[in-house]
Amino acid sequence: MTLLTPTRKTLALALAATLLAAAPALSFAQAQPAPAAASMQGASPSQLVLDNTKRVLETLESRRAEFTRDRAALQKFVSGEFNTMFDRDYAARQVLGRHGRGASDADVKAFGDALADNLMRRYGSSLLDFNTQLRVRIKSESPLPRGLGVKVSSELLRSGGEPIPVDYLMRRAGSGWRVFDVMVEGVSFVQTFRQQFDSELQRKSIAQVAQELRSGRIAADASSD
């Protein structure tokens, strides 16, 4: 089993934590057709994250042998869950920061798709090292400034170890909720990659960086600070 460095482990945890919130966005969008239904028990982002944690962890555990043997099946599972709940375009604009001002929706989408696909290729297999015996405890749900959405603060509880703090930043997308940033132990998914790609984006266009991510010439890298 590969030993993850602290930074790489943090990203693997962020990906795993993101998967834990995957099904809620879809189930909420499908199961809550009327605005009034949003007040129903279990409709909050916190409850949706909590309710679906068990299913995702059980899937990773029950299919571990299959995923170890068939990495294509793992990638399909990871990509499917990730695509369901992660607001790629909004997250991409956050990662681009000042470089995204005035950028076309098409360029932002291309960058977001390339970044997500690169992450899945590089770090998806790290989920095979993930401790599926973890439990999740929701600590709080609080509104983000300027009505941007909500922050769901949680902890991953592990036997014999300190709880791992995980915060989800979520926003309304259509009739459901989607995650646009995950913070594990205070490390932000968005901030990590905003810093990493800043120098590239100073020298190249968004389309060029997206193409190089897609081709593998540059990579979303969490192996060093």
For the regions a language model picked out, list residue spans one by one.
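Low-complexity, intrinsically disordered terminal/linker segments enriched in charged
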Residues: D181-D225
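Bacterial N-terminal signal peptides that target proteins for export
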Residues: T2-L15, A25
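C-terminal segment of classical bacterial N-terminal signal peptides
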Residues: T18-A29
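Compositionally biased, proline/threonine/alanine/serine-rich low-complexity intrinsically disordered stretches
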Residues: F28-K54, E58, Q208-Q211, S215-D225
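Solvent-exposed loop/turn segments at secondary-structure junctions
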Residues: G100, D117-N118, P143-L144, L157-R158, ...
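Surface-exposed, charged secondary-structure patches
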Residues: F111-D113, R121-I164, G216-D225
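Short beta-strand edge/turn micro-motifs at domain boundaries
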Residues: P163-Q191
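Early exported N-terminus immediately downstream of N-terminal targeting peptides
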Residues: A38-Y123
